[in-house]
C-alpha cells in the first residue's frame, strides 16, 4: 500500500467517515500502535466504532474535529497521515450517475477551497520523516494534481517532498476513479 503502514506506528485517518480505510489501516497495523480516526461528524465515528468492534480492531482512538485544537494537539505526532479529502465525487459516477447533474461550478470552487484548507491544516500532523497520502475519488486535476502542486508551493508545503502519485480512471480500470499522492515530510 502507498502509505506503507506498519505495526507500532502512529497513524491518523483525518477524514475517517464510517471507517472503511480506517479498518484497513488497523488490519495492516495488526492492532499494534496508535491509530486515530478523525471526522467532523460524530454519527460517522459512532458507525466506525461499531464496525471496528465487529472486526476486532482495538487500537483505534476516535476524535471529532470540533475545534482547531484537535488538530494542533497532534502537530508533528504521526508517522503516517491519510487525507481522503472531501471532493466532487466525479470518480464514482459509474455508481452514482445522477450526481453529475447536481454538480454546480460554485460547489466545485467551494470543495477546492475546503481541500486546500484540509491539506494545509492536516499535513501539520505528520512528523519529520513521516508520510502523507492525499486522496480523492475525483478525476478532476484541479482537485488532485493541481491541489498538490498548490500545496507544495505554500510555506507548509515546502516542508514536504513529492514522492509519487497515481490516478485511476474508471474508463481504463473498471474500478471507481480516484487519485492518490504520496508526500514525505522533510527531516
Predicted feature residues:
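S-adenosylmethionine
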Residues: 1-187
